[in-house]
Amino acid sequence: MTLQETIIKELGVKPSIDPKEEIRRSIDFLKDYLKKHPFLKTYVLGISGGQDSTLAGRLAQLTMEEMRAETGDDSYQFIAIRLPYGVQADESDAQAALAFIQPDVSLTINIKESTDAMVAAVNANGLAMSDFNKGNAKARMRMIAQYAIAGERKGAVIGTDHAAENITGFFTKHGDGGADILPLFRLNKRQGKQLLAALGADEKLYLKVPTADLEEDKPGLADEVALGVTYNQIDDYLEGKTIDPQSQTIIEGWWNKTAHKRHLPITIFDDFWK
């Protein structure tokens, strides 16, 4: 089995999908988890205004609407959280995403004060936190906030990790990668777009240039620039297609380099890293 075949199998990516079937599959998955864990009453997710959180958020909202209808229990709710660092440049996109998602509850927690306090505390020890490291601190602070809300509201935190992100390890370890449940896992980037289109989303919600936007010295840095490869190339690879050798080398390089992100903390019995 080639490395490409191994990755496709591990991530569960299909070469093509029926968007409506995958929408149903994700909603049923989220519902089944709640039914198995009756002490859980909410799903919590940070909404950035990007494709992935918009899709996961709408799926979560539909899940809770079905749970209420089926059980008569109005405590089943989806909590969407805006988590800006100061003023977000594309706040209008985040508001458009919320308008589409129509969450039961919408909260805002600005992470600037807490993030800056952490940076100052580190710097006070004679270190100088880099802009890149600070960006990761922002992602982790956002997850701290989501778990704080989930803990108060009998909730589980939804993550937005999908196959095109997972293969490259393009997420912050213990940040956006530290969720409880991943309804988009198995989908590549273009398949996520197909689900949003099937859900009736305005195309501006899934055609905007993807960016983590964590680094202040590189505002709005496109994912594809940071990765050195396009999502179309990543998606083609995940669908089993032949892509150019340079792009394949880059993708497989990311897969190998970020293996630690896809594992629990390394123990003496692990050998994947050797």
Swiss-Prot record:
Binding site for ATP: G46, I47, S48, G49, G50, Q51, D52, S53, T160, K189, T211
EC numbers: 6.3.1.5
CC terms in the record's Gene Ontology section: cytoplasm
UniProt catalytic activity: deamido-NAD(+) + NH4(+) + ATP = AMP + diphosphate + NAD(+) + H(+)
Binding site for Mg(2+): D52, E165
Annotated signal sequence range: none
Pathway: Cofactor biosynthesis; NAD(+) biosynthesis; NAD(+) from deamido-NAD(+) (ammonia route): step 1/1
InterPro entries the UniProt entry points to: NAD/GMP_synthase, NAD_synthase, NH(3)-dep_NAD(+)_synth, Rossmann-like_a/b/a_fold
Top-level EC class: ligase
UniProt-annotated binding residues for deamido-NAD(+): R140, K173, D180, H260, K261
GO molecular function, one term: metal ion binding
Keywords for this protein: ATP-binding, Ligase, Magnesium, Metal-binding, NAD, Nucleotide-binding
Gene3D superfamilies, A to Z: HUPs
Pfam families named among the record's database cross-references: NAD_synthase
A biological process term (GO) from this entry: NAD biosynthetic process
Superkingdom assignment: Bacteria
Role noted for this protein: Catalyzes the ATP-dependent amidation of deamido-NAD to form NAD. Uses ammonia as a nitrogen source.
Family according to the record: Belongs to the NAD synthetase family.
Subunit (UniProt): Homodimer.
The protein, known as: NH(3)-dependent NAD(+) synthetase
Natural source organism: Streptococcus suis (strain 05ZYH33)
